[in-house]
Amino acid sequence: MSFRKLIYISAVILAVIACKKDEETESTPYLNGNLTIVGLPEFVAPGESVTLSPKGAEHPDGGEITYAWKVTPSMTKYETIRVFKHAFSDTLRTYTVYCSASAEGYTSITGMSYATVVAPGPNGSIQGIKFKDIAEDTVYVRHMPYYYKTIGTQTWTLNNMAVRTGVPFRNAEVMSEVFGRYYNFNEAKAACDSLDTATQNWELPSKADWETLEAYITGNSAYGKTITAAMLAPATFNGTKLYDYWPTVGDITNGSGFSAMNVGYANTVAKSTKGEKEYAIFWTADEANESEGYYKYLIIDQPGLFTGKGDKESFGASVRCIRK
């Protein structure tokens, strides 16, 4: 038999085998259902342990299903177990969690979700704001430092309040001291009261206080091209910028030292948040009417410090305080 003929016969045999495998693969049914992961928070602390379980996979014949798990980039191989326990590392980043459901004679299905490791503090998730270089001093509530600085004739706190009322970002408690919390109108006033000491009195700033701040910053062109650029911090969250460059605003400089972060706003009833990377919103002490209060806000792509109204009970904004 010639070599060419042998090669031809071999190719035909391989093609038949391949076709048979394709037919087998195509004829293998999938497990039923949509596999999801139960017990995984969106944000976790360094070293936090979680216990995860699968939900939604169904065997068409009621047979046994085998589950396997993998967390990347921490794991290179799947671990076969139904209820999976995992301790996240101290590295601040987003991890992908996979769960695979398989059964003999069926094509497996996979569920996937994410968890981000976050931490507060100078070496934490927020970088780009050097509070110790900007601030004049610090006041503590429990273990949490609140930095403050004199801007013009006023003394302002430089980081968002995080005392335990209001709601945290996406209702994740571990984010409380990272972005600060979102408070309704009445909670905002109480948050500033928590800073009071024997020698210092702190209050929620009025509209007039904010307007004084605005006039001082806009009168100092060295702070930045616009008030938005001068008040927003060039902050990053786990290495990702919280801001984009807009020619109308100019380079984000934080020249005033105010260190605003565009972390959006909340519905304190639904415990949901929106507008991150777009708005930095702060309550004032002034009522607009019986059901609404005034707030001040920055928009990442627009120059100006604007005024809005929010429901006293359900609208959640960040809080800064002024020393009186």
Please identify what each model-predicted range represents:
Residues 120-324:
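Conserved positions within compact, well-structured domain cores
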Residues 49, 80, 91, 137-138, ...:
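Coil residues (strongly favoring Ser/Thr
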Residues 43-58:
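A short beta-strand segment in extracellular, disulfide-stabilized domains
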Residues 68-87:
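Surface-exposed, flexible coil segments in extracellular/virion-facing regions
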Residues 88-94:
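Surface-exposed, short loops/turns at beta-strand junctions within beta-sandwich domains
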Residues 3-6, 11-41, 106, 110-134, ...:
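Bacterial Sec-dependent N-terminal signal peptides
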Residues 58-68:
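Solvent-exposed loop segments of extracellular immunoglobulin-like
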